[in-house]
Regions:
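Short, active-site-adjacent cap segments at secondary-structure transitions
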Residues: 15-17
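Short beta-strand segments at enzyme active-site cores
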Residues: 6-12
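Acidic carboxylate-rich catalytic motifs and surrounding loops in phosphoryl-/glycosyl-chemistry enzymes
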Residues: 12-13, 46
Length: 154
């Protein structure tokens, strides 16, 4: 924001599913997330935030080719979004300490996060690039976009 780069908040719309129904308590953003009037909010309907959403058209409109990706559900929403963005040839920086998940039946959340950070560091992208960096490494970066994925996928 300090450099006037656009910020996009992605919010899961689970209308009709019984979870994360639009305008319900579980749909609301966390109080810690500060949404400014200049920020963009885009509804998502699946783990992949590009699926049937306005995200691709908004990124095209803003002439964005570089993405910072953060969010909830590392192993669902964040992973699906990264895979989808790579097939669209975006240059991606995953914020290493900017995504989270819950405990899973066979893995603690910490191990899930550690595993996906490793996967993304060792991935062979299409025409874009993918990096995993700690927030401290990128806070002064001059990239053109930040994606904040606040949606829940599972």
């Amino acid at each position: 924001r300090e450099r006037n780069f656009p910020v996009i908040y992605i919010q899961h719309d689970g209308t009709g599913t019984g979870e994360f129904e639009k305008n319900s308590l579980d749909w609301e953003n966390l109080d810690e997330l500060i949404v400014e009037p200049t920020d963009f909010r885009i509804d998502k309907y699946a783990n992949d935030i590009f699926y049937k959403s306005e995200l691709q058209s908004k990124l095209t409109e803003l002439n964005v080719t570089e993405l910072f990706i953060t969010g909830c559900a590392t192993d669902f929403c964040v992973e699906s979004t990264i895979q989808s963005a790579l097939t669209k040839d975006y240059n991606i920086t995953v914020v290493e300490n900017g995504h989270t998940t819950g405990e899973r039946p066979h893995l603690k959340a910490e191990k899930v996060i550690e595993h996906y950070n490793w996967v993304w560091r060792n991935m062979i992208p299409t025409n874009g690039k993918i990096e995993v960096k700690n927030f401290e490494e990128i806070k002064n970066d001059t990239t053109t976009m930040a994606i904040i994925n606040t949606g829940f996928g599972a």
